[in-house]
Amino acid sequence: SNASRGLGDVYKRQHLIYSLIRQQAKKNKKKVIVFAEDVAASGGYLIACAGDEIYANSSSIIGSIGVIYSSFGFTELIKKIGVERRVHTAGKNKSTLDPFLDEKKEDIERLKNIQLDLHKDFIEVVEKSRSSKLKKSEVELFSGEFWSGRKAKDLGLIDDIGNANQILREKFGEDVVIKKFEKSKSWLSKKLSSSNDHVDQLANILEEKSVWQKYGL
């Protein structure tokens, strides 16, 4: 259904990444250090919890420990433009929360129950990762709110303020070798790559907007 694609699939991928990191850390007996240099919110923070230690910049965005589902309702629009919606399913609940159909109370209740289950699971991950480091009540920490890196440190959501180069050199010495694995340039950036600065800026804006949407912000 539309709800399952927009809600469960995203959380499932994020939780899978978290689980795989923890499995590899345990298998290889390695300590995991996470650096949130930009944003570690919502699913990003869930993944960050795979770290034995979490560091961030003072201006990083941290938290948003919650579950969100959003969509639009187009029922009045398709009536105005004379469009007839035709849906054929095997299973009466397959079209749950279809944006072209009226919302049903029972569908909203079902969605809310799923959100509560996922939120509970998210909270358990955070509590397992941060345990006694958390310094505020559940009501405040798990409300879906997000904070700056500096405030997140005060709340116990991260261990300290600092970037990867600084922290790793402090821990392992000035001669430590840091290998960086960067994401390859996206299809959009390659397609819009140009000597025209305005085109490049537009590509960057579109990519940044897409990234923030993934964090649920």
Model-derived regions, located:
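N-terminal organellar transit peptides
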Residues: S1-N57, I68-L217
